[in-house]
Amino acid sequence: MGQPEILRATPAQSGALTALMHASSAYQGDYASILDGYVVTPGYVETHPTFTATTGGELLGFYALLEDPPELDILFVADAAQGLGLGARLVGHMLGEARARGITRVRVVSHPPALPFYLRMGARRTGTIPPNPPKVRWERPELRFDVPTG
């Protein structure tokens, strides 16, 4: 696999972004309900800075950054691309985008199994989000990235 290219997503990619999310093994079983009916729309991609990681035209991952208030809303890496450092590259890119937009802190409400990843990336845990049934029946870690200034 070559070095993935990280580029701004286009609204035309919204279907592929949705498919990548729904194919994630991290959201099967008990966690499947959170994605039930969830669609990344063309309007979402137009409104929020959304970036894809691709290699040879293959979508390997993406993230979306909300600006007001600042939050890493979505971060997914295809199952086959996990463990290769792509998640770290996407987080680094997101922090660069946040800095370029004058954002100093980025909130993350994490999928519970992803908590160790975010801590390794430098996020600090700030709290716990309670369950919100019926879609979210579990507590979720809340974290924050302090955006480097340099």
Short names for language-model regions:
Residues 1-12, 147-150:
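Conserved N-terminal entry element of GNAT/NAT acetyltransferase domains
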Residues 11-74, 78-79, 91-92, 97:
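Acetyl-CoA-dependent GNAT
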Residues 82:
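Glycine-rich ATP-binding loop(s) of histidine-kinase-like ATPases
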Residues 107-109, 124-143:
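Conserved catalytic-core motifs of GNAT/GCN5-like acyltransferases
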Residues 118:
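Conserved active-site tyrosine of GNAT-family acetyltransferases
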